[in-house]
Amino acid sequence: MISSKPSKQRKLVYNLPNHLRYKLLTARLSEDLEKQYGIKRISIRKGDSVKLMRGSQVGYEGKVVEVDRKRGRVAIEGLTKKKADGTPVYVWVHASKVIITKLDTGDKERMDAIERKRKMREEYFSKKSPKEVS
């Protein structure tokens, strides 16, 4: 039996192994990408272009420079702040606070995964009746 206690759910996330943390690093696709690829969300990768949807920098667009699986956050090109000594450091943003505006399509395996997800989604919605979908 799986617990529904919030404290145990948080503990599960905190103690999750690194090779499973990529599942927490998913973000929605923009509307035009959603129509183009037929999926709603995908894991964020270095090289994707994203747009901030929450926080003080809302609307900022840039390329993902680094992904920190342990903290579940991404660094975006150009989104920096200065330390006390003047050196710039990245502002780390939680993956759920961004929308992917352009995918890095250089990896064939990723494109195969997108195609797999699209087919599964189409299959799922084709089985449901029109009344259940809406």
Swiss-Prot record:
GO terms for molecular function: rRNA binding; structural constituent of ribosome. Coiled coil: none annotated. One of its GO terms (cellular component) is large ribosomal subunit. Pfam families: KOW, Ribosomal_L26. Keywords: Ribonucleoprotein, Ribosomal protein, RNA-binding, rRNA-binding. The keyword RNA-binding applies. GO terms for biological process: translation. It comes from the Archaea. Disulfide bonds: none annotated. PANTHER family: 60S RIBOSOMAL PROTEIN L26 FAMILY MEMBER. HAMAP family: Ribosomal_uL24_A. One of two assembly initiator proteins, it binds directly to the 5'-end of the 23S rRNA, where it nucleates assembly of the 50S subunit. Belongs to the universal ribosomal protein uL24 family. Part of the 50S ribosomal subunit. This is Large ribosomal subunit protein uL24. The lineage of its organism: Archaea, Thermoproteota, Thermoprotei, Sulfolobales, Sulfolobaceae.
